[in-house]
Amino acid sequence: MAGRNIDEKLRCSFCNKTQDQVKKLIAGHNGVYICDECVEICSDILDEEFETEADAKEVVDGMNINLLKPKQIKEFLDDYVIGQDEAKKVLAVAVYNHYKRIMSQSDLDVELQKSNILMLGPTGSGKTFLAQNLARLLNVPFAIADATTLTEAGYVGEDVENILLKLIQAADYDVEKAQYGIIYIDEIDKITKKSENVSITRDVSGEGVQQALLKILEGTIASVPPQGGRKHPQQELIPIDTTNILFICGGAFDGLEKIIESRMDKSSIGFNSELKEKSNDDVGEMFHKALPQDLIKFGLIPEFVGRVPVVVSLDSLDEEALVRILKEPKNAIIKQYQALFGLDEVALEFTDEAVEAVAHKSFERKTGARGLRSILESVMNEVMYEIPSDETISKCIITKEAVEGSAKPLLEYRTDAVKKAQ
């Protein structure tokens, strides 16, 4: 075997410089060499990477994120959200894993992928409220965005980057802090593809928006206009890394239960046959059986479904649950009104029949927990108008008749006389 030519100069295997062009050439196995200049470059790269990791850890530590165990997270949610036990468990685990991943990034050899969340549930079932309480518990910035306002770039409407601006604003323009926040995108079911068939018309608020959301959901350096609106060349943009932002997408997904039922081949023959009317309970049960293929059939593109691997199904709220929502949580609506009346030194009381009547109205309107406050506002608006001007009122009693509109709330006066509100 021929030996090395003695006139052949040794070279760095990385930059190809000869031994005469560098100060030092270090030999490795199998004739591999590296020069002092390449060693210095590699050292700088590693220092920069470690410094970035240290900076990120410093930001996370400085935020005082209150990371509790999944059981503790669920117990906290139990104080504010009635029912939805399975959904709370899934959310607790997903949120715990997300922030545990962030806090342990520099300690792991394996890169853990982010798991964004998709919540399925009828209007008023508590999707937004769950997300809000999670952010409050964790002490991280939180923003809510409406998917229906988003359009593809170049069309009238908001760019997807405007979602990130809301989070930056929630963090008081502290971008580092915003990069570890939570964004809840509501009405995500409204940006589904209008049809499985290719159309000649442009679907500017459907598939195109889903495509635009993919990068920020997965993790990218996005450029955000500081004042919102469309980006233009002269504008100075705010860069933000979305890698560690937790995205929770929610929607009512009206009609998804029919797709699930058709797949399961229950109560129907053939996919497009008419399906029987389902009760709210049946719909909730069907949502628990949703598979990625059902969501794709509904109109979410496969890539989008892949970016939201954690699917949480919320149950429809029955009248009993609505009654509990009115009375039991720490910040129950009735407790809020009682505190409000207390500021005017007036006691507020609801009869059991009145509470049931409010729950019944909301259930009939199919507005869920969201409709409870508007019903109470309409019942008590007149008396809330009168009370601040009449210091003799000591107590207000809301009856079933007051809720139904056939009578006014009862007022007790400091003279102990009981009269109807005039």
Curated annotation (Swiss-Prot):
One of its GO terms (biological process) is cell division. Zn(2+) binds at C12, C15, C35, C38. Keywords: ATP-binding, Chaperone, Metal-binding, Nucleotide-binding, Zinc. GO terms for molecular function: ATP binding; ATP hydrolysis activity; ATP-dependent protein folding chaperone; protein dimerization activity; unfolded protein binding; zinc ion binding. Coiled coil: none annotated. ATP binds at P122, T123, G124, S125, G126, K127, T128, F129. One of its GO terms (cellular component) is HslUV protease complex. Residues 1-54 form the ClpX-type ZB domain. The keyword Mitochondrion does not apply. InterPro entries: AAA+_ATPase, ATP-dep_Clp_protease_ClpX, ATPase_AAA_core, Clp_ATPase_C, Clp_protease_ATP-bd_su_ClpX, ClpX_bact, P-loop_NTPase, Znf_CppX_C4. Pfam families: AAA_2 (PF07724), ClpB_D2-small (PF10431), zf-C4_ClpX (PF06689). PROSITE patterns: CLPX_ZB. SMART domains: AAA, ClpB_D2-small, zf-C4_ClpX. PANTHER family: ATP-DEPENDENT CLP PROTEASE ATP-BINDING SUBUNIT CLPX-LIKE, MITOCHONDRIAL, ATP-DEPENDENT CLP PROTEASE ATP-BINDING SUBUNIT CLPX-LIKE, MITOCHONDRIAL-RELATED. ATP-dependent specificity component of the Clp protease. It directs the protease to specific substrates. Can perform chaperone functions in the absence of ClpP. Component of the ClpX-ClpP complex. Forms a hexameric ring that, in the presence of ATP, binds to fourteen ClpP subunits assembled into a disk-like structure with a central cavity, resembling the structure of eukaryotic proteasomes. NCBIfam families: clpX, PRK05342.1. Belongs to the ClpX chaperone family. This is ATP-dependent Clp protease ATP-binding subunit ClpX. It comes from Lachnospira eligens (strain ATCC 27750 / DSM 3376 / VPI C15-48 / C15-B4) (Eubacterium eligens). The lineage of its organism: Bacteria, Bacillati, Bacillota, Clostridia, Lachnospirales. The gene is clpX.
